[in-house]
From Swiss-Prot:
Listed PANTHER family: KELCH-LIKE PROTEIN 31, LD33804P
Kelch repeat spans: 317-365, 366-419, 420-466, 468-513, 515-565, 566-614
Domain BACK positions: 172-273
Domain BTB: 73-137
GO cellular component annotations of the record: cytoplasm; nucleus
Protein's name according to its UniProt entry: Kelch-like protein 31
Post-translational modification as stated in the protein's UniProt record: N-terminus is methylated by METTL11A/NTM1.
Transmembrane regions: none
Coiled coil: none
Keywords: Kelch repeat, Methylation, Repeat, Repressor, Transcription, Transcription regulation
One Pfam family per UniProt: Kelch_1
Species for this entry: Mus musculus (Mouse)
Domain of life (superkingdom): Eukaryota
N,N,N-trimethylalanine modified-residue sites: 2
Amino acid sequence: MAPKKKTIKKNKAEINEMTIIVEDSPLSKLNALNGLLEGSNSLSCVSSELTDTSYGPNLLEGLSKMRQESFLCDLVIGTKTKSFDVHKSVMASCSEYFYNILKNDPSTKRVDLNDIAPLGLATVIAYAYTGKLTLSLYTIGSIISAAVYLQIHTLVKMCSDFLIREISVENCMYVVNIAETYSLKNAKATAQKFIRDNFIEFAESEQFMKLTFEQINELLVDDDLQLPSELVAFQIAMKWLEFDQKRVKHAADLLSNIRFGTISAQDLVNYVQTVPRMMQDADCHKLLVDAMNYHLLPYHQNTLQSRRTRIRGGCRVLITVGGRPGLTEKSLSRDILYRDPENGWSKLTEMPAKSFNQCVAVMDGFLYVAGGEDQNDARNQAKHAVSNFCRYDPRFNTWIHLGSMNQKRTHFSLSVFNGLLYAVGGRNSEGSLASLECYVPSTNQWQPKAPLEVARCCHASAVADGRVIVTGGYIGSAYSRSVCAYDPALDAWQELPQLSTPRGWHCAVALGDRLYVMGGSQLGPRGERVDVLTVESFSPAARQWSFVAPLPVGVSTAGVSALHGRAYLLGGWNEGDKKYKKCIQCFNPELNEWTEDDELPEATVGVSCCTLAMPNSVSRESRASSVSSVPVSI
């Protein structure tokens, strides 16, 4: 037998020593350290917040390891073929679906999701524990289905962003379909825009031929569909119809979306009328007849305007018309320029004749040019006033001469209201004019209306509150502050509150519910012409004028137009420098500030400006060569 071990008894001193060690706890140590701070003024006690950037990933890694080991798992999620052990707290923290279930019954041990695919659920659970997932177009369907059902919004957004990044001609319609199924508005809108912008390439893909009638119909209705010409849209529609004879029943409904009025008469005869379906189907034939009548009745086109006569895929751009360029003072310009948002100023076309101080207006998609002067004679401008009136069609790059004004006019104003044009005042060789005449497109005639109370020229007008408001100008032998309004419904004039500053050769433009008057000149203290820099704004509702930000550069006989809620003031004459100007000044009413935009190609006075809806650059370049060489028949 082994000898017994001898027990060593501890004396009282040793016991007391052990007690001292135990009492030296973390709290005691803390108190001891805090005591060192008391009475010390040299130590900084400013607190700082620190973040352990690895804490979150480490926590997720730990939770994921616990799930793999089924350690402390307290919930089972089941599908028809597979079950998963998870932690309630993890699933409830990222899924509104689980949060609501467990909040309602915290004792829940199992949740069965028989409508969710095991692959989708497994991916969702992995995401909940790691914040990571692997996506492909082959698996995203089951994943996004589970994410939407379980209301995991961050995962839904990741799937939506993935779809947007993956959009291509081959899969764009699949993206539209899946986005529509799960209400992914951003992904759907992005995919639809991709299809609109790449419609020609998309029409050559296999997906295009699989479109339902509703899907292709929605595309052909779209105003923003990018095409080289509407004839191509017709040929693409026929291609879809011809693919399956069962689709013939949709021919009239589908082709009603083609803007036949924007196809030239020659192309209608050569490439549309030759398609048997367009002659055999009564409804399709009517579409063709309506388009031909539209072309045969140019003076009635305003009243015949419809969705099928409007261009698609275009944009609204600034247009300049005529004027007197500074580098060739003795020569007037026939040029019409447009400002491309990407490429700057380019020549669009030429007017039938040179002019400046003419007036322009846009109505029903057409550009109208009226009056002005056909010769450069600074000493007697009124002598060369003309009554010419013509219309430009941007769809076909064509001009037609319209009925001349009843009186020759220069330094007048031209306004559009309710489908009619109103020419106000001005002057000619007989002097200043008080007359007002109205152009009626359906009759191609000008009708006299109630005249101004007093003759005036060099004024500016714009339409606001349903009336043509005429501001300032030259009355008698003086600049005027007078403001009056013409009511077309009453054929009557009414005086309005006057401008604060007299001015002439200025501009007026309507932005929102207000009228803005800018630029022009007046007489200085020594009788000399001086620039008017103040800009005034009129509220028809309050019948009150107020000042807004002044012009950076004073100009007279400039052009003005509104675009995207801003006013653009182009070119003109500066009295201070005695120079023609090429500057473009932009006014933002929301910020009440002027900025200098780009410049005109050449300093110009007597230039007119407007905003016109133009076909996209592709269509402008290829309208004459956009006809497909592949015949279609159905």
